[in-house]
Structure formats: structure tokens, C-alpha cells
Amino acid sequence: MTLLALGINHNTASVDLREKVAFSPDKLKEALQQLESHPEVTSSIIVSTCNRTEVYCDVTHSGPGVMIDWLAKFHRLSAEEILPSLYFHEEQAAARHLMRVACGLDSLVLGEPQILGQVKQSYYSSQEYDAIHGTLEKLFHKTFTVAKRVRTETDIGGNAVSVAYAACTLAKQIFESLSDTTVLLVGAGETIELVSRHLVEQGCNKLIVANRTKERAANLAEEFGAEVIGLPEIPEHLHRADIVISSTASPLPIVGKGMVEKAIKARRHQPMLFVDIAVPRDVEAEVGDLNDVYLYTVDDLHSIIEKNREQRKVAAIQAEAIISEESAAFMSWLRSLEAVDSIRQYRCFADDIKNDMLSRSLQAIANGVAPEKVLVELSNKLTNKLIHAPTRAMQQAAHNGEPEKLSVIRETLGLDSIKD
């Protein structure tokens, strides 16, 4: 059996090709069922996200040719269309690649945690369709353990490297608990949606979404349990917010110094955090001059993100060392299983010979043959039976001119330590 990983990702393939090779939920079921019945595949998992499509399998052959042909045929493409963008790994390299993917080291955003959840979901899907067994299943179990170790022993996921996540991290640094805060989100685009998701994950449960059109904001409100207001209503609600995060496409500022002064007064000077992600700015720069106000712009966030990227690179080096160690340990353990099977088979072989010879000897004694004669015959036959296979192997190695093989057999049998 050979562990094999092949696929395409954001580094090797265009969006157009990634779309063609992606597996929808319906396609995933069909694909896993095909692989389960494939004569050369014993176990398989498919990881398909917006940035990658990868097939992990345990196969009866080496080399990726059969799997490349299957992947192309399944998506009604020619092998030539996908071959330039494909990468593949075997055995320890395949194990190492999977661990790197699950730990976020192969992601567009270094160290991003979402990929681990996606890999786990792929594993559960493969389980559901009874497509994963044996060695591959053990590899995925090991990978999840390694990912946990990497998250625990390194800071690969501890530093924000996206604007949305950096905004939430900043809020968490200033306010001890986000569950006790009210957050006003200005805008309802993709960035604000990501901010909302991060805030809810961090325990925030009081969201107000202000947007030019309430229909768009209503979608966020439904998903995250937020209150919806229009942009003109911001002045009357601003004092309720401990945190304001803004990202609109407005050409002019939406929140002015005077508006914030009134809000601070109504709050009896309890501090407010403003995170202005918009370009041009949504919050007047003069707001930052007010007491009890913390104002951060997108430039401030970018400097934080750049610093965090460098810290993640250091953590990534530590993570790579862990993965190299763990992938080597996994393959060593896997090879030891092969030795265990061989030892068990050899013991069974020897036991069968022993039991057969013993049965014959006892029967001979019962039939009146002298015990001394039976013992001599037993020892001779037992010796001949046990040395037959290694004797043939040495003769064959000598006949074929294979001195290395002959040397291994001699070492295995301990012949080099016997003095003439």
C-alpha cells in the first residue's frame, strides 16, 4: 500500500481551474463512492475548499497516474488540462503535506484556523460514506493531534493577520470581556460580515448594524441576532456603543467629532473604541483628539497585521519542526506495524511446523517406535523445515549475483558472529 496525496491549490491553479476541479456536496458523495469501489484504492478522503482540492488515498500502486486520470475523468477534463497545476506526494511526504495543510501552513493566510475545521469535515464526510479505513484513517487521527500540538506549543494562530480579525483582536485587548459590550457596526459589506462573525465567536452578543439600506443589514441581523438601524439614526444610538467598527464606501465621514462629544457626555465619559476600516475614512480624524476615545484607522491595523505576520512566520518555523518530527514518527510507527505482521506470520509458520512435527512424533511413539529414534527424527526434520526457506534465499541470492541480499540474510541469521 502507498499513501498518496495530490491536488491543486491557490498557489498552483487559477480560480477558473479551481472551480472546475472543486467537489460540491453532491459530487463529493459520488466521488467517494467511486473511489471506494476503485480496484486500486483502499481508502480515500477529499478535501475541497475555495482555495484547494486535494485527494488523499491509500493505493495499491505507486505514482499518481491512476488518480490523475480518475480526477480528470470525474470532472470531464483532460489530464493535460490539470497536470501543469497538480502536485503530488507519497508516503512521509504525503503525511507531512496533510499536517501542513491542517495546521494552516499551506493556507493563503498563514496559520488560519478555518482549514482545520474543513479538513475535519472532509474526514467526517468520508466516514459517512464508508470511504476511509486503516492507515489513512490513522493518519488523519494523527494529523488532528499534531494540529492541536502546533496550536498549543506555537503562536501560529495567536496574532491577527486580517483587517476584520485585527479589529476584533484590538477590541478584545481594550475591553476585558466582549460579552459585556455593545458594538455598533457601520456598514453591511463583506468586511463587516467577517467582523460580525469574529465578534460573535469571541462572545459578543449585543450588535447594532447601521447601514444605508436596512435590507442588507437585515441579513446580518438575522444571522447574528443584531439590531438594525439606518445611517441617519446613528447620532441617537451612538451613546449605547462601547465599540464602533466602521467600513462603508461613503465619500464623506459618517461620524463627526460633535456627534461623538455628545455620545461621550451621555455615557458619562465611559471610554469608547472606534475602529475605522474604511478608505476614505468614515470617522473624522479629530475624533481621536477627544478624551475617553480610542481611534484606530486601517493604517494602524495594517501595522499591527504586518507585525503579527512576522510573528506568525517565526511560529511557522516552530510548527514545521513539529510536523517534520511527527510525520517521521508516524511513518516509523507504520513501518513497525509491517514488522509486527511479518513477525506474527513467521511465528505462526514456525508453530505450524512444530505442531505438525510434534503430532507425528507422538503418534510414532504411540505406535511403538522407540522414543530415542523419534526424537532424532524430530530434530532432523524440524531443522530441515526451519532452514529450508533461508537456505533457498541464500542460494537464489548467490545465483543472481546479489551480494548485498546475501549479506542481509547472513546478518539476519547471525552467521557473521559464528566463528568457524
Swiss-Prot record:
Residues the record marks as site: Important for activity: H97
E.C. number(s) listed in UniProt: 1.2.1.70
Statement: the UniProt record of this protein carries the keyword Oxidoreductase: yes
Residues the record lists as binding NADP(+): G187, A188, G189, E190, T191, I192
Entries under InterPro entries matching the protein: 4pyrrol_synth_GluRdtase, 4pyrrol_synth_GluRdtase_dimer, 4pyrrol_synth_GluRdtase_N, GluRdtase_CS, GluRdtase_dimer_dom_sf, GluRdtase_N_sf, NAD(P)-bd_dom_sf, Shikm_DH/Glu-tRNA_Rdtase
Top EC class, one word: oxidoreductase
GO biological process: protoporphyrinogen IX biosynthetic process from glutamate
Record-linked Pfam families: GlutR_dimer, GlutR_N, Shikimate_DH
Domain commentary: Possesses an unusual extended V-shaped dimeric structure with each monomer consisting of three distinct domains arranged along a curved 'spinal' alpha-helix. The N-terminal catalytic domain specifically recognizes the glutamate moiety of the substrate. The second domain is the NADPH-binding domain, and the third C-terminal domain is responsible for dimerization.
Family affiliation: Belongs to the glutamyl-tRNA reductase family.
Further remark: During catalysis, the active site Cys acts as a nucleophile attacking the alpha-carbonyl group of tRNA-bound glutamate with the formation of a thioester intermediate between enzyme and glutamate, and the concomitant release of tRNA(Glu). The thioester intermediate is finally reduced by direct hydride transfer from NADPH, to form the product GSA.
UniProt-recorded name of the protein: Glutamyl-tRNA reductase
